[in-house]
Structures are given as structure tokens and as C-alpha cells.
């Protein structure tokens, strides 16, 4: 016997592939085994038993009326007559005799073989081999897509990912998270489902729905305690699965080789079925038990007509009918498969029912080979697709990232990052994380939260636990916010800083923060660069006092006018873009501080002169060359701080004397060569910065500034200091470094409050010992060359070094 197991390799496949074998493939596999057994059984009989048994035919000669036989008739006789036998001597004894052919065993074997080859129909001879070959072809066709490299690699990869997704603890955890959603989200989902149900009156929607999914409405009942027991390792494994599913989906959805190959192998099986049915039905009658054999072998055997018995004809006839039945069932199954392939839209797969049953609304529909494999899996078990769908959801992925983030950033680890910011608030900076850890909201002492380069941030309702939170910084973050969290921020948030690159990073909910006092915006608002990024109305920001815009606008945004009545400080940092239209400034009547930095201004804007409440004006890093308009500042009675630094101003007009209320004047980094004596008629000046200019002489009228506390002429060309400078008894900081001074007057000892002195970079040879009279001056506050410091008396040096 030939063992059937020898043919296993033709249909052998990995056990995991069974998930891609629908019921019809399993059924045809069993039919193939049955047909294979028929073929093997027939072949075994062919090999082990006699194929045919033949006997010569006796042909009687034609009879004549004459007593003498005709010689020619005797010769023509087909079969020679045996020689006459003598009659028995005893007539009473009867001997049984058969027909004798005088043929030996070798001749019989020769006759059998010749008649088998010449007389027996080819179908009767090769029937079992045909059955065996056809069955093997069927088996090869059924499993070819599992063996072909272009398709088997995708199948193996898919099944590997599918098994891991099915067994992953995150699947249960994700469904648990969905079942615990906020009531608000559930209500929204119900409303959406009701609306969609109203629109679709019939049972069929636009998307293809899997029949198996409709027939098995699975209800997920999740144990919360078990779902919460996802450790860090399992979280990392689930995260890796999400990445694998993403890459696999992109790869498989590009083509349809699996679908095309499955269709082709099914079509091939149908064609083969039709051929088998056609020729077997026509030839099955050729299998006969008795076969007449006429072969010209009379010279070797003495006979040429034989009557043969095909020993297996009866069995082969029954096997052939049985085989035809199996093939018919096989073919009908293949025809049903073709109907399923062409009637159903297998290149698209909708998770509509999964979305409804699980509540995960963002599971995407898939197409091409990815969709085809999911349809095949549904024929095996729809639960695989449902659990696999969890790893296609961005919501599920974000929740996993959130869980991993919470495990990584514990409250103790976050508290180690706390620091005090420029506003003297306790701040937590978080940079380039995958999300916002929920553990942040356990740090109740937090006053400022700074998020940088974090995508898809969701601010939950638990932010209400941060009772002390007043400041929020969002730098290149796309932020969504829960309605309860928004209500909390409307009541508590005082400072908001937003740095954005596109519209998604400019939160739309910021326009409703009614208690917001400070708003800092950094990003492009230019129509040439980002046409969609515009400021909406700020009229709801009733408490806004400070507005800072660092952008490249050509005019003051119209939205700023909405808060002009209560805005106190306005800052525009324009990154070199020319600020042309400033008429909106006139409407900001309550403005006390104005900064127009790097706006490419060539003149002081006339709109500034209308701001009667203005106290501080900063025109840093512009292109100012002349400030003749400064005379109009006399109308600004409250102006105390004027910053004209980092410009190209060559001289200071005498009209500056009319700014009698001026207390702080910044003129550094300009091209001023001459200091007008009228400058010092502003006798309220406490801070005067003239560093980095081309000044050579300081007028003695500087002694009039009795309130002067800070004076800097660093990096000029001054050769001597007037003695009147030392009349400024309140001077605390004196910076005269990098000049051409050669002598430091002993009168410096009159500056009893001097605590910082910079004289480095001059031509001093010795320091006056009167520096010791400056009791507030210590070694750390004295910027001087070490060698020059050693020229002081030892007691003075010791005094300065002492704490």
C-alpha cells in the first residue's frame, strides 16, 4: 500500500494559517483527502493485483457436406484443432476434460500484457492515476497562496500580529477605558448614532458590513481591576504592536496580490472541475468487466483472438462514480466561493458595527489586501477582527501612550523638575513628551504649567485639582480641552503664553478666558506665510491687561482694538518686519506700557503721542536715526521710562529737557557722540544708560542728577570724568569700563552707596585708596584687572574681600 501521509507535503501548512481558511476551504480540504484516498487505493490495486486475465477463444471451422475435409478450409481455420484422442478402452469410465490450449505460463503473461496495452481503454488503465493527479492539483491550488513568497510573507506577518493583538492585555484595558468614558462623550455618541439612523432609513449603509459582525453582537464586560493591571512591560509591548499595525497597514493596503491570487486559484479549480466532469462523464462507461482482445500474436501463441477479464473493472466503475460525486460537490463549493468573491465587496472592510459595539469611534475602514484578510478571518471567528480593531484606533493608542506616560512620570519624579519662573511662580516644565501625564494633576502646589513641543495634548477635567494654577505656557503644542477643564481655566487662569507655528497650535478656547490678565502670543500672523492664522475677537477677555505679540505683522491686529479700553501693556516684537499702520494705537487710551521692538521704525510713531496715560515706551532694535519728534513727549506727563536703545541715533536733541518726569533713560547701542547739557535738566533721572556709543565728553551738569542711582558709559571714548559726577550721592552702580580713562578721582570715596563699579578696560595705573570709603563696595562688585586691584592698600583689599 502507498501511505496517504506521503502526500501530506502537498497540503501541509502552518497551524496558524487556519484563521484564513473559511468553511468552504476546510470542506474542500476534506473532499480532497477523500479523493486522494480513492486515487491511492486505486493505484495500490493497480500495482499489487493482476490488471487483466485473458484466455484464447476457440473458433470452430466451417462444416462441408463432403466426408473429406477441405484442405484449404483447414488451413484457413483461425485456431488449430487439437489432435484427435483415442477413445477410452473402458466405455464405463467417464473422464472430465477441459479445453486445452497448450500454452505455458509465460505465454499467458505475454498475452495478458499485450491485451492490457492494446485492448484495454486508456481511461480504465489510468483512472486511479488521473484521480491522484487531479486531487494533488486541487490541493496545490488551494494552498498555493500560503506558499508563494509574495503572499505568504504578508500572511505570516499578519497572523503573527493578529495573534499578539488578540492575546494582548491592552485589548481588554482599552475596552475598559471606553466603558468608563465620561457621560458627555457618551451622550454625544448617542446623538450622532440617532442622527445617522434617521438619515439611513434602510438597513444598509454606504459602507460594507461584515455578515458575521452583524450576526454576533458581542458585549464586552470588563473587570476593572483586571483591566487596570497593565504593567510597564505589557504597555511597551502594546506600544510596539501599534507601530507594527501601522506599518503593516500602510504596506498591505498598497496592493491586492492576496485577493487576486485567491480569485485566480479558485477560478483555476472551477475550470479543472468542469474539465474533470466533462471527460469523466463521457468515459466512465469505458470501464468494462469483459474486454475482447484481437492481437496478432498467432506466431508466438497460436491464437490471435482472446477474451479478457478486467479484474478491477467493477471496483473502478464504482470508484469513478464516487469520484464524480466528490468532484461535483467540490466544484459546487468552488462556484459558491466565486459567488462570494465577486458578489461581496471584499476590497473594502468596514468596522461600523465594531465602532457601535465597542464605542471606539475612530477605528478606520481598510481596503485591498488588508480588507480581504479581515473578511477571511470573519469567516473563521469575528472576534479576531474586533480585538484587532483596537490597535487601529488612534484613541486607543493615545490612551496607551497616556498609561505608559503615567507609569514613567510619577508624581515624585515630576516634583524634582519644579522650579521658580520669571514671574516668581512655582513652574513645572515638560518638554517633548508624548502627552500630558495625568500625574501632573496630583501636584496641587503647582502654580505654572509649561508644555513645549507636545502634540495632541488633552487637558482633562482633573486639572481642577490644581487650585493654585494661574499660568499656562503652550509652546508648539496642539491642545484640546475638556469642557469641565475649560470652565476651571476661565475662572482661575491669569497668564497664558502660546507659541505656535500653525493654526492647530493656536487654541480656539483661549478667546473665552474671561479672567485672563496676561496673554503672550509668539508665532506667524502674516498673511503671506500663513493665511489661515488670524486672531479672532478678544472682546470676551474682559480682564486682559497685558498683551504681547511676537510675530511679523504689518499693522496692529484689529482684534486688539476689542480690549483697548482696559489694556494696560502692549508689546509688539516684529522680527524686523516693518510695522506700517499704527492708527489702532490711538484707541488704547489706558495704555501705560508700550513696546515696539524690531519693527523697522524710522521715526517715532505719531500715534504714541496720543497715549496720555503712557508711562513706559520701548523702541528697541528699530531703525531710528533722528528723534526730533521727542518734543511731543512733553504732553505725556506720566512718561517715566524711555528706551531708545539698539538704534542708529546720532544725537540727542535739546528738546529732551522737556521730559521732566523722565526717571529711566536707555540710550545704549547707538551712535551718539555728544551729550547735550540739556539732558541733565531731567533731574528726576535715576537710571541712565549711555553705553556702547561714541561719547568723548561728559558735561559737568551731570551733577544735577541727585537721584541718579545707575550710570553706564561702558564702551565709549571718554578720557576723563567730571568731578561733579561724584556729587550724585545716591549712585549705586557705576560702569565706566572700556574707555580711555587714565585717572580715577579720589572723590569716588564720596559715593557711600556704591556697590558695583566697573572700571576694567581703561588705562589706570593705580587705584585711589579712597575706594575704601565706599563701604558697600565688595570685591565681587568691583570689576577690575587683578594686577590693578593689588595697587590698593592691603587693608582696603581685606575690607572688600570680607563678607
Curated annotation (Swiss-Prot):
Subcellular location, record wording: Cell membrane; Endoplasmic reticulum membrane
Induction description: Induced during the earliest stages of adipogenesis.
Disulfide bonds: 54-308, 115-293
Membrane association type: Multi-pass membrane protein
Domain of life the protein comes from: Eukaryota
Cytoplasmic-side positions: 1-22, 145-262, 340-803
Record remark: domains: The volume-regulated anion channel (VRAC) channel forms a trimer of dimers, with symmetry mismatch between the pore-forming domain and the cytosolic LRR repeats, a topology similar to gap junction proteins. The cytoplasmic N-terminus preceding the first transmembrane (residues 1-22) regulates volume-regulated anion channel (VRAC) conductance, ion permeability and inactivation gating.
Protein name: Volume-regulated anion channel subunit LRRC8C
Taxonomic path: Eukaryota, Metazoa, Chordata, Craniata, Vertebrata
Gene for this chain: Lrrc8c
Amino acid at each position: 500500500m502507498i501511505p496517504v501521509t506521503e502526500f501530506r507535503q502537498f497540503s501541509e501548512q502552518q497551524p496558524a494559517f487556519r484563521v484564513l481558511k473559511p468553511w468552504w476551504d476546510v470542506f474542500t480540504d476534506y473532499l480532497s483527502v477523500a479523493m486522494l484516498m480513492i486515487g491511492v487505493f486505486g493505484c495500490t490495486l493497480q500495482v499489487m493485483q493482476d490488471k487483466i486475465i485473458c484466455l484464447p477463444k476457440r473458433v470452430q471451422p466451417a462444416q462441408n457436406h463432403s466426408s473429406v475435409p477441405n484442405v484449404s478450409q483447414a488451413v484457413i481455420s483461425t485456431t488449430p484443432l487439437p489432435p484427435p484422442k483415442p477413445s477410452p478402452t473402458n466405455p464405463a469410465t467417464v473422464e472430465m476434460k477441459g479445453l486445452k490450449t497448450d500454452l505455458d505460463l509465460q505465454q499467458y503473461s505475454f498475452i495478458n500484457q499485450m491485451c492490457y496495452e492494446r485492448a484495454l481503454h486508456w481511461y480504465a488503465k489510468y483512472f486511479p492515476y488521473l484521480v491522484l493527479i487531479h486531487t494533488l492539483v486541487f490541493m496545490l491550488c488551494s494552498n498555493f497562496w500560503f506558499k508563494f513568497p509574495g503572499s505568504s510573507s504578508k500572511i505570516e506577518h499578519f497572523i503573527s500580529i493578529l495573534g499578539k493583538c488578540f492575546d494582548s492585555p491592552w485589548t481588554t484595558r482599552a475596552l475598559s477605558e471606553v466603558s468608563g468614558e465620561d457621560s458627555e462623550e457618551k451622550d454625544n455618541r448617542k446623538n450622532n448614532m440617532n442622527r445617522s439612523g434617521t438619515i439611513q432609513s434602510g438597513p444598509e449603509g454606504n459602507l460594507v458590513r461584515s455578515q458575521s459582525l452583524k450576526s454576533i453582537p458581542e458585549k464586552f464586560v470588563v473587570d476593572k481591576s483586571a483591566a487596570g493591571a497593565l504593567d510597564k512591560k505589557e504597555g511597551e509591548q502594546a506600544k510596539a504592536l501599534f507601530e507594527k499595525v501601522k506599518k503593516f497597514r500602510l504596506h498591505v493596503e498598497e496592493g491586492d496580490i492576496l485577493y487576486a491570487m485567491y480569485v485566480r486559484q479558485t477560478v483555476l479549480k472551477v475550470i479543472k472541475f468542469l474539465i474533470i466532469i466533462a471527460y469523466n462523464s463521457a468515459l466512465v462507461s469505458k470501464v468494462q468487466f469483459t474486454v475482447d482482445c484481437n492481437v496478432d500474436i498467432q506466431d508466438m501463441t497460436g491464437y490471435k483472438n482472446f477474451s479478457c477479464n478486467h479484474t478491477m473493472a467493477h471496483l473502478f466503475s464504482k470508484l469513478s462514480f464516487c469520484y464524480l460525486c466528490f468532484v461535483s460537490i467540490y466544484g459546487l463549493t468552488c462556484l459558491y466561493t466565486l459567488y462570494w468573491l465577486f458578489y461581496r465587496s471584499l476590497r473594502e472592510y468596514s468596522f461600523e458595527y465594531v465602532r457601535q459595539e465597542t464605542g471606539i469611534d475612530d477605528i478606520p475602514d481598510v481596503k485591498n489586501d488588508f480588507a480581504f484578510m479581515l473578511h477571511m478571518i470573519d469567516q473563521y471567528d469575528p472576534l479576531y477582527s474586533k480585538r484587532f480593531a483596537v490597535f487601529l484606533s488612534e484613541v486607543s493608542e493615545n490612551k496607551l501612550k497616556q498609561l505608559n506616560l503615567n507609569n514613567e512620570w510619577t508624581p515624585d519624579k515630576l516634583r524634582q523638575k519644579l522650579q521658580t519662573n520669571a514671574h516668581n511662580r512655582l513652574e513645572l516644565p515638560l518638554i517633548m513628551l508624548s502627552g500630558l501625564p495625568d500625574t501632573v494633576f496630583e501636584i496641587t502646589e503647582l502654580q505654572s504649567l509649561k508644555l513645549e513641543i507636545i502634540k495632541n495634548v488633552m487637558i482633562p477635567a482633573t486639572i481642577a485639582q490644581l487650585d493654585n494654577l494661574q499660568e499656562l505656557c503652550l509652546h508648539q503644542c496642539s491642545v484640546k480641552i475638556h469642557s469641565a477643564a475649560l470652565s476651571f481655566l476661565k475662572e482661575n487662569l491669569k497668564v497664558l503664553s502660546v507659541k505656535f507655528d500653525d493654526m492647530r497650535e493656536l487654541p480656539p478656547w483661549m478667546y473665552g478666558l474671561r479672567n485672563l490678565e496676561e496673554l503672550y502670543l509668539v508665532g506667524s500672523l502674516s498673511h503671506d506665510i500663513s493665511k489661515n492664522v488670524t486672531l479672532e475677537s478678544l472682546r470676551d477677555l474682559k480682564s486682559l491687561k497685558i498683551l504681547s505679540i511676537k510675530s511679523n505683522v504689518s499693522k496692529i491686529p484689529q482684534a486688539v482694538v476689542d480690549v483697548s479700553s482696559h489694556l494696560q501693556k502692549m508689546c509688539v516684537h516684529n522680527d524686523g518686519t516693518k510695522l506700517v499702520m499704527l492708527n489702532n494705537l490711538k484707541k488704547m487710551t489706558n495704555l501705560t506700557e508700550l513696546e515696539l521692538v524690531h519693527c523697522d521704525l524710522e521715526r517715532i510713531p505719531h500715534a504714541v503721542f496720543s497715549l496720555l496715560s503712557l508711562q513706559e515706551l520701548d523702541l528697541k532694535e528699530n531703525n531710528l536715526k533722528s528723534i526730533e519728534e521727542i518734543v511731543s513727549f512733553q504732553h505725556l506727563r506720566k512718561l517715566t521710562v524711555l528706551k531708545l536703545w539698539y538704534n542708529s541715533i546720532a544725537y540727542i536733541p535739546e528738546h529732551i529737557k522737556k521730559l521732566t518726569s523722565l526717571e529711566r533713560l536707555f540710550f545704549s547701542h547707538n551712535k551718539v557722540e555728544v551729550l547735550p547739557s540739556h539732558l541733565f535738566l531731567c533731574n528726576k533721572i535715576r537710571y541712565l544708560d549711555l553705553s556702547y556709543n561714541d561719547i568723548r565728553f561728559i558735561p559737568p551738569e551731570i551733577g544735577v542728577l541727585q537721584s541718579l542711582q545707575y550710570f553706564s558709559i561702558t564702551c565709549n571714548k571718554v578720557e576723563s570724568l567730571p568731578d561733579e559726577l561724584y556729587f550724585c550721592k545716591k549712585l549705586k552702580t557705576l560702569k565706566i569700563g572700556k574707555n580711555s580713562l587714565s585717572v580715577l578721582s579720589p572723590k569716588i570715596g564720596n559715593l557711600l552707596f556704591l556697590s558695583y563699579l566697573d572700571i576694567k578696560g581703561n588705562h589706570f595705573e593705580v587705584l585711589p585708596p579712597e575706594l575704601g570709603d565706599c563701604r558697600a563696595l565688595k570685591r565681587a562688585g568691583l570689576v577690575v584687572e587683578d594686577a590693578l586691584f593689588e595697587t590698593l592698600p592691603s587693608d582696603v583689599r581685606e575690607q572688600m574681600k570680607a563678607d
